[in-house]
């Protein structure tokens, strides 16, 4: 099974603070300020495990085709389970949503049982939670209960699961145990072994970041820039301005991509004051991963991106992102990689356009044209589209191969202190189309992406709807080079939005460093062991 375990591999500590229960719109809920959606789901799973054990009700832990945790129970024990849950949830905002029949509203388990149906076969249980900013943990983050019919020779399941069909011959079933979340669970042999459709390899993430508010950095940058001619918008304040977007970009990883193994922050700035030391976070200085240190210092993101594959300890498969790019909802590793490691990139509708590179264009537009010419010379195919502003998947071995094949272009870009009209843009399109043309990348056509120019009033008007519906896998809150909105007003609106969209402090924030909390989400390097 891909990327699920406790962070420390042991039994998670119990929370010491009694939950606050509130009523909102006629429904009760916990006020949640510490658990991510996945952590809350696991906490509910462990809660249900204890209820079942105390009631002496046998169960199996299985996984469905979407890797949601499922507890399978003999249908003859459903009435007893309903009574046990009603008693255990007397003071809990535990709700049950019937999956058998779409459209049925969730019911409060303590008073209304498991379903409005007389004979439900699949229900989803969850403790309703409300986080700061109004983020609600609903049935999407629930634990599924399935009621199986045990006959003399077969077991009939209401739906297929990740391993088996709806009818299980009893003579083909081999019970076993699996250790997950600090506990031993009864299951079926093969259920939690790595499946061919699983992404089981390590995936790291790299962010590039600069603290543009540092007066010394700004002075050094301006002094060196005066000696160069830069393209349209490349000298803009927006290139370096930051309002703690990195904090919320990292929160988005913690909340929605807990399968990320390690996070590297490529920066020569002083670490932000909110960042605590944490084993999952590594600050990487340019001198640690630039092949040619004589090229430093650099103020060129293209240069930094051309050297990412030299970061010590970086996994073969990794994601790269800027601090203005966010995960908008829970994502699987398969959004970025196939089980065999093929990368999946997201093309934008925007065309690169006509014309060659020239000093008057922006560095972004020039690099796309340099990429296009190099790839045409190598493969005889023309790339036509930019990529979306999202985190991108990369493979270290492919980048090493590219640097060997295009040594002059990599070296020239790494040595350019500012964006130049001869730069390549490795992470924006060069890698992805090179990998596509060599059979190691494919377009990702299912992702939902939103780009917002937060320096325009039209862009700011999109934020309330974005927060309310949370319907995008990725969104970018870009700081445009030609602003319409005053900087202070933009900062207030954007930070307010981000704080409400990502209300759960990550464990590497100083505000969370001393808080006792469950610690579930750092992935294993392999699937959990069966029979443990």
From Swiss-Prot:
CC per GO annotation: peptidoglycan-based cell wall
Keywords of the record: Exopolysaccharide synthesis, Transferase
Keyword Transmembrane: no
Gene Ontology biological process: polysaccharide biosynthetic process
Highest taxon above the source species: Bacteria
Keyword Calcium appears in the UniProt entry: no
Root EC class: transferase
Any Pfam family the entry gives: Stealth_CR3
EC number annotated for this UniProt entry: 2.7.-.-
Miscellaneous: Stealth proteins are part of a protein family that is conserved from bacteria to higher eukaryotes. Family members were first identified in microbes as proteins that help pathogens to elude the host innate immune system. Microbial stealth proteins are involved in the biosynthesis of exopolysaccharides. Stealth proteins are predicted to function as hexose-1-phosphoryltransferases.
Protein name, UniProt field: Exopolysaccharide phosphotransferase CpsY
The encoding gene: cpsY
